[in-house]
Each structure stands twice: as structure tokens, then as C-alpha cells.
Amino acid sequence: MLSRRNWLLAASLAAAAPMTGLSRLQPAARPGRTEPGFRIKDIRRTTVALPYRPVPARNMARELPHWVYSEICEVELANGTVGFGETMLYYTWGATSDEDVNFANGKNAAAIMWNDELGAGLQMACFDAVARAIDVPIHALLGKQAHTRTPVAWWDIDLPPEDVAGYTAFKTKGRPWFDIWEQAKQGNAAAPKGFSITFDYNDTLLDAERGIPILKAVEQYPISKMVETPIPQGDILGNQRIRRETKSAVAMHYGNPSPVVAIRQRVCDGFVVGGGANRVMTAGRIAGMADMPFWLQLVGSSITGAWSRQFGAVLSHASWPAVTCFQLYAAQPTKQNVEVRNGFTPIPNAPGLGVELDWKVINQYKVPKPPARPEPERLLETRWPDGRKLYIGSNGNVNYMLRKFMKPSNLPYFEPGVTCHLLMNDGSKDWRDLYQRARRRPVLTR
């Protein structure tokens, strides 16, 4: 027989499982629902290319050089209030299209702001405008405040060991083309007490049989307290085995497998939650009902960092450090940066997002919107101590290197001593020939 608590949980999970169309079912925000002053009078969009800081720059260049591009969206209401938001153009749960702008123009911002189909920047700007118009922080529109500060983590893509040393807390990648044992060792040697590194494997451990020995080796270091997606999330039995046989908490992206399966089958310890406002609030409440922690993963500059804090204010189980990636950038488009102390950032109570745009910075880094995702030619060389070399070239796909290691293949698995770097284009015929071969298929030599 189901207990009352389990029955309520099951019923809520069943109701939340079909995420498609939830934005249309979500009640519109009440403040100003019929007030003409909340009508959207104008929508303006500005593209910027924010420069990376030095360490992220040399590592993001391998697979994610396009993360520098963001679009700032401003929404002006009939009452004169202006709100703003941000879309990271080439890494987002939803980009704001011209069709979305045409749909929103003339509409009541309070009536449409829960519609995740607006895309990141436009939805964020609608919330910001409505909250500013009624002089409250966005979190007052989301629910009752549960926290006055929220945890936040540094994030960067896969790094060689020497770039790990010296950081205080961050989430990074575990990859077959870097020495995971040395990454953990050097990170641990530089870490102060209480420091932790979360390695996101993005499926690359492939299965529990091969992955568990690596996870056990890494978790011997005190800095290793959590892992993300060590093997494919749909491998229920494999993930259950990892949880049984290792100590580190396992985080999975919410929605795969379905929340019903993930919670009932205990395939993870908590979630990674992202997406639009409606999806984030739904996922956060389901996780709270299941008493499972999660981190918010809403990625962008300091604008998105401020947006993430609003959800961290009201979601009780957003207790794992949030990933927003504002730390990657040498310049921020807001006058106020995200202040982080001892792993936490305070939640502002100023109206809207609680930050203001810095037009000096925006105008400095303003660029024409690219017609498509920029795709510079990149050739990666991976080396092993025994002399093997692997060459993989960019081929128009995001994560062109990662994709080749996410499924079983004849490519090398995790090994000690491996390292990877960009092989710069020296203009030679040899480089061009190798690149053309490596972009078609991996080239492994001895």
C-alpha cells in the first residue's frame, strides 16, 4: 500500500512528467494582468562578444569558442519601464527568434512571461520589466523566499592538471583526453579545506564496469564529493551500481530518465536543473517533494547570474552550487558583478534582476549578430606516453571531440599520462592535409 507521502509524490510526478505544453498550462502572473501599462511597447536586441579570461580562453578555444556571443534583450512596457535579459546565442535551452519578438510585441508582459517558448532573453526581460514595474525583485513573482543567499560554483571545460591548481571551487569535465588521476591529484594538492571539484563525464565512462574503478580512484581525494553523468543516464542498472559501489554523490540532468523513474529507481542523488522559468520551477518543486538536492544550471554572463539567483531564492532544494559560467568572462554587461564569498552569493532585493546594464561595456563589445554559429578551423592533438597520437578536426558540430567518445568505439579509453592541445594552423600543406583527414574521421598514429 502506498503511504500518503508516496501517493502525493507519485501523483505530482505523474502530473509533471509530460513537460511539453506546461508553459501553456501555467497560470499567468496576477500582478498587472489586465493593466494596459504592462503592454509591451518595444523589444530591442543587442549582440555582444564578451572576451574570455586567460585560463578559460585557452581551454574554451578547443571546442567552445562561440560561447563569447550573447544577445541582450530589452523589453519596454507602455508605462515606460524597461526590463532586460540575455540569451547565450549558441548554448541555450531556447533562443529568442524574430517570430518570438513578433508574438510578444503588444502583449501584456505579465500574461506571457511564464511561456518558456519565448526563449531565454525575452522571457527574462519580461520578468524583469514586470518586477521593476511593481517595485519587487523577480523572486517575489516566483514564490516565497526560502534563502537569502545561494551557493555558486566556478565552471570551465576540461582542463589540463596545471590549470586546475590554484582554483578554490569549481565544476569541470572528466575526459579521456586528459589524465583524470592527475587532475584530481593536483586539484587536491592546491585545495583548501572544504574545497570540492565536480567532474562531469558526459557519458564518457561509458559503463559501470569500466567506470567504477576510475571513480573509486578519484574519490580517494577529499576534493571529489560529486560526479555528474558518469555513464549514459538511461542506463538504470549501471547508475544504480555506481551509487552502490562509490561514495561520491551522482548528479543527473533532470528529465532523463523521467523524474518518476529517477526518483523511484534511485539512479542519482540529485539533479541538474535548467531551462525556462516554468520548467525550472516545476523541476525544483518536484525535487523538493522528493527531498533531493539540485544545482541550477542557467548559463551566461552576470545577467544570467542574477537571473539564477532569483530561482535560488525560492527553491528550497537548490542547495548544490549553481553553474552560471559568468566567471569565464573578462568583462560583464552589468554595473554590478556577482559577488561570491565563501562559495555563496547574496540574493538582491532590488527590483527586477537587481542589477543594471553597463552600456559602456556593452557598446565596447557590441558586434553584428553572426548569421550562423562561428566555426573556426580547429585541430586537436591528443598524446599518450607510449607515443600514440590522435588527431580530431572540427567538423561543424558542437562538441565535435566529445561526441566521438560518448559511445563505445575503437578510440582509447581513460589512461594515465594523456594530454591534449590545439595544434595551431601554421599555414603549411601538412597541417591542411591532416586537418582535412581528421575532420572526416579520427586519425590515430604511433
Protein language model features and the residues they cover:
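N-terminal export signals
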Residues: 4-27
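C-terminal segment of N-terminal export signals and the immediately downstream linker at the start
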Residues: 21-59
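Metal- or metallocofactor-binding catalytic centers and their adjacent structured scaffolds
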Residues: 36-47, 75-134, 386
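Short Gly/Pro-enriched turn/cap motifs at secondary-structure boundaries
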Residues: 61-66, 114
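Conserved, mostly hydrophobic/aromatic
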Residues: 80, 135, 227, 308, ...
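Shared catalytic-loop signature of beta/alpha-barrel
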Residues: 104-110, 223, 234-249, 255-357, ...
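Metal-dependent enolase-superfamily TIM-barrel catalytic cores that perform enediolate-based chemistry
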Residues: 140-246
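C-terminal extensions of enzymes
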Residues: 335-446
